[in-house]
């Protein structure tokens, strides 16, 4: 009892600012219950720096007390001593649009810096008053529908640096454009539209002179008309993460781009020309090759220093890129492998990257085709010309997910025997501890076999991650 009383006194004797920080680590509805302890604790809740106002009740059980809880908690923002800077508001039930919007206005008018607004039910958001001079980070997610007039001066959030838009349906394309342009100092934009249950909400355009980081996930296979034209007018962009089905045409202004991460998805299964037959009815893969074109996208990222490609991207670039540009500035290339996707474009990528220093490959097993070139061992040695690896300047090779199979070992042998400038090889061995009862010995067998492979570079050292 004495120890408990001392601990209780230590907490109660702490300064209000410390207690406010402690309460900030608790869910808001738990922190709010401390107000019944004493008058002092009742005055501590305004000292928390974040509010989590979320409905986490099981589906079908409407939280009748949630609106009252939200309104009483948001009233804390009116206190002069309030230090609340971050608010997460998530509504799973309908509580009336006027009430919902009054909550939003309260948050925006009280100097909050970070606002996460989320709803699984459709709510209209009046854009004329959807504005804040202090907000730095904003996430709007779910069934929200911004519509109405622009704020005075056309500025929504003059201080906003980071904006995340997740499955939000704007009233029209102009409203979306105005919303982004209404954030004049925006540095990072995240657009996520990948849910067939809702129609696409992105018009394929991003225009902002200030954006430095752009992440887009746009995956609507049932809406090909939304993938016709993609336009990036982002002269300050340094980082691009783009995932979506390949479009018909790309246009961009991205002269500052340094790093790109691409996950280009095909509309149909792509077929090599040497695998096509004469029974062609005018539709399918060859029709896709005529109607979709990744050339513009690849050309506009050709100045990057770092490039990451998914396994789908490898095949899309091979089949739907008419001209491979020179990647003169590329220092690091990484790509993923898949047993259903080929490496046909890898030799061309390596030959187009004369200054490449680091090569990262996630998985060595890929689809065997007659057109994989000489970056791998898919074709017989006697039919190969000079290996593209011989002229490659790669100094660091990193392999992730190495399982030590016969095919993987042959591929590693091919790399080590041809990469003349190689200095460091980093390998992350993958052993299934659940299925392998002798995982430790399996790991040693894999690593020992790899260490015994001959190396053309006398400076090459192998490290295991």
Curated annotation (Swiss-Prot):
Disulfide bonds: none
Occurrences of domain F-box (ranges): 8-54
Matches recorded under SMART domains: FBD
Origin superkingdom: Eukaryota
Alphabetized SUPFAM superfamilies for the sequence: F-box domain, RNI-like
InterPro entries: F-box-like_dom_sf, F-box_AtFBL13-like, F-box_dom, FBD, FBL60-like, LRR_FXL15/At3g58940/PEG3-like
Protein name: Putative F-box protein At1g21990
């Amino acid at each position: 009892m004495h120890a408990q009383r001392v601990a209780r006194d230590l907490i109660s004797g702490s300064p209000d600012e410390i207690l406010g920080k402690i309460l900030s680590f608790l869910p808001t509805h738990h922190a709010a219950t401390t107000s019944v302890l004493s008058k002092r604790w009742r005055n501590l809740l305004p000292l928390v720096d974040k509010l989590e106002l979320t409905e986490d009740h099981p589906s079908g059980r409407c939280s009748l007390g949630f609106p009252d809880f939200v309104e009483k908690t948001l009233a804390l923002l009116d206190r002069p001593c309030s230090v609340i800077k971050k608010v997460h508001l998530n509504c799973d039930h309908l509580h009336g649009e006027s009430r919902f919007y009054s909550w939003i206005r309260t948050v925006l008018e009280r100097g909050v810096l970070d606002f996460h607004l989320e709803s699984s039910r459709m709510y209209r958001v009046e854009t004329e008053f959807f504005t804040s001079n202090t907000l730095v980070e904003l996430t709007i997610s779910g069934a929200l529908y911004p519509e109405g007039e622009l704020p005075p001066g056309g500025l929504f959030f003059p201080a906003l640096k980071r904006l995340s838009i997740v499955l939000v349906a704007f009233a029209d394309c102009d409203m979306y454009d105005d919303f982004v342009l209404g954030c004049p100092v925006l540095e990072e934009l995240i657009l996520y539209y990948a849910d067939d249950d809702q129609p696409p909400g992105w018009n394929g355009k991003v225009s902002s002179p200030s954006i430095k980081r752009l992440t887009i996930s746009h995956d609507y296979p049932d809406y090909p008309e939304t993938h016709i034209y993609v336009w990036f007018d982002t002269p300050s962009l340094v980082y691009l993460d783009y995932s979506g089905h390949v479009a018909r045409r790309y246009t961009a202004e991205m002269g500052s781009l340094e790093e790109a991460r691409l996950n280009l998805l095909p509309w149909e299964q792509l077929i090599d020309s040497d695998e096509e037959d004469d029974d062609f009815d005018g539709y399918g893969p060859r029709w896709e090759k005529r109607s979709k074109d990744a050339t513009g996208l690849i050309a506009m990222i050709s100045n990057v220093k770092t490039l990451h490609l998914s396994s789908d991207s490898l095949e899309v670039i091979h089949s739907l890129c008419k001209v491979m540009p020179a990647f003169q500035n590329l220092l690091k290339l990484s790509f993923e492998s898949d047993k259903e996707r080929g490496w046909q474009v890898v030799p061309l990528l390596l030959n187009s990257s004369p200054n490449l220093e680091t090569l990262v490959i996630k998985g060595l097993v890929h689809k065997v085709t007659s057109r994989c070139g000489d970056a791998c061992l898919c074709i017989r040695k006697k039919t190969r010309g000079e290996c593209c690896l011989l002229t490659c300047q790669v100094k660091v090779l990193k392999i992730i997910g190495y399982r030590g199979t016969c095919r993987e070992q042959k591929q590693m042998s091919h790399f080590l025997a041809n990469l003349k400038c190689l200095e460091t090889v980093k390998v992350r061995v993958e052993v299934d501890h659940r299925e392998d009862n002798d995982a430790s010995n399996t790991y040693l067998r894999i690593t020992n076999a790899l260490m015994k492979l001959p190396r053309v570079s006398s400076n090459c050292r192998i490290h295991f991650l």
